[in-house]
Amino acid sequence: MLLPKDTNAHGTIFGGVILSQIDLAGAVEARRYTDHSVVTVAMNGVEFKRPVYVGDLVSFYTRLVRLGRTSVRVKVEVEAQRSTHGQEIVQVTEAEVVYVAVDAEAQSVSLRPD
């Protein structure tokens, strides 16, 4: 649930807050495919479809799009359950995020040992 501190000048949830949560949710999915840390290298196709309001219950759904040698591409879809409209569930945002596996020196590494 997002709070009033997360709002923009229009009284809806600031897009940057949603992007931050997309990044976190996608990283959890990416980590399923490597024992290394992952870093975000790109956010593609970000689409804010509908606003998110204070009090909405927001859910993030992830799925693998592509597994490369060092990278993982993840689709993240965001839904909001409206607290004021009979618990209506609407898709509010989607994005594809690319993560790269890195070592302790922040150098890209293979997702899995050879």
Predicted features by range, described:
Residues M1, V41, V46, V76-V78, ...:
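Preference for bulky hydrophobic residues occupying beta-strand positions
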Residues Y53-L57, V65-D114:
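HotDog/MaoC-like acyl-thioester-processing domains
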Residues S20, D56-F60:
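N-terminal, well-ordered alpha-helical segments
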